[in-house]
Amino acid sequence: EQKEKYRELSQKLSLLTLQFSENCLKETNDYLKVITDSTLLSGLPESAITAAKETAQEKGVEGWAFTLHAPSYVPVMTYADNRDLRKEIYMAYNTQCTHDNEHNNLDVVKELANTRMEVAQLLGYKDYASYMLEDRMAQNSEAVYNLLNQLLDAYTPTAKNEYAEVQALARKEAGSGFELMPWDWSYYSNKLKNEKYQINDEML
């Protein structure tokens, strides 16, 4: 009976995982940001502008079209001078599958978490992480958290220094009251890299 229950739960997990992935893919493929004002393209490398023009032609729209796929998304976040454009694309990318449509993954995630807990309890574990980690190097979730805390302690000073540098550059360019937001990070960190080392991501 336990084996049969485990088989049912495993099959359910597989289907939920597949549904989650398919929803993400569909949401990504459905998104299209169309731009007809060329001034919004300021800062973008020629390769990204050309690709956006080709995407627009493929989709049968005027102007330039951007998607949430990495070759389109990354250049906007890294090079687009227009902050509102960066924010719009960033928010679209990071809120995928949370909207009120057929691709919403919120219920899928809840069902995944509940089913994983069922599997763990069926097999005598306190949670799914303990079940998954038993045969791995970490062995349990406590060991994972200990390692993460060690990494946090080790890298926090460096991260704070890097953030301060990027924030300082942003304020130098955009004004003393400028507050760095997630959609600004790639843009200004790339500028800082270029300023310090005369190199940027496009060159790489």
Where do the model's predicted regions map?
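Short, 15-30-residue, compositionally biased linear elements
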Residues: 77, 103-115
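Second-shell loop/turn segments in exported
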Residues: 72-79, 97-102, 133-144, 203
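Active-site-proximal, well-structured secondary-structure segments within enzyme catalytic domains
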Residues: 4-7, 11-67, 110, 115, ...
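Active-site-adjacent "gating/activation" loops or surface patches in catalytic cores
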Residues: 58-97, 185, 190-192
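Surface-exposed loop/turn segments and immediately adjacent short secondary-structure elements
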Residues: 85, 89, 101-102, 118, ...
